[in-house]
Design a protein with these regions (language model features):
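Conserved structural scaffold segments of CAZyme catalytic domains across common CAZy folds
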Residues: 1-110, 116
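Aromatic- and carboxylate-enriched substrate-binding clefts and catalytic-loop regions
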Residues: 83-183
Length: 183
């Protein structure tokens, strides 16, 4: 096999260390890959806390999430990810107050969303925001306006071209509103 020049190949990297620090703080993926699309905003990567990994769905409530904001602040972390059910357990109407509290501690917030769509039958909310471009853009405008820093979009239906287009559409719309994205 040959490679026409100038050529490129996908990068594969492994990061190892005696503790988690070099793994979570590595910048290798950003150092070796040129961005496919330019962004309108400058984004700051950082560390965060996430209650769901330990406490699961029951932790998605105002009081427990405040504890995670306090933990992030005490550790000097930049972010807290609030997982599924935030829309019902904390409430959209209370989210601005919650974000104001987080900002008072110098912590930013990521919120979880289902990718939704016909392929997706999960019940965890919020659902039906990310698969429709009109609804998605309206939601991202709201997120930006209340001070959310990013979103985690979860439960995609495979890796077909349609799904890859949805990934790109979410990234493009998020960039229009200055939101970072975790998939």
């Amino acid at each position: 096999p040959g490679l026409a020049l100038p050529g490129s190949t996908p990068w594969r990297t492994i990061t190892v260390g005696e503790n988690l620090k070099p793994i979570v703080e590595t910048t290798i993926p950003w150092d070796v890959v040129e961005p496919l699309y330019p962004t309108e905003h400058t984004y700051k990567m950082g560390r965060g806390t996430w209650s769901w990994i330990l406490w699961q769905d029951g932790s998605i409530n105002f009081d427990d999430q405040k504890k995670y904001v306090d933990l992030a602040a005490a550790m000097g972390y930049e972010y807290v990810l609030i997982d599924n059910w935030w829309d019902t357990n904390i409430g959209r109407e209370r989210m601005k107050d919650f974000i104001d509290y987080a900002h008072s501690k110098k912590v930013d917030i990521f919120l979880w969303y289902s990718s939704s769509g016909y392929w997706n039958d999960i019940v965890q909310g919020p659902t039906n925001y990310m698969d429709n471009p009109i609804i998605r853009k309206k939601e991202m405008k709201w997120l930006h306006n209340i001070g959310v820093k990013g979103i985690k979009v979860d439960f995609f239906g495979g890796d077909k071209q349609e799904t890859m287009r949805l990934y790109e559409a979410i990234l493009s719309d998020a960039d229009d509103h200055g939101l970072m994205v975790i998939f």
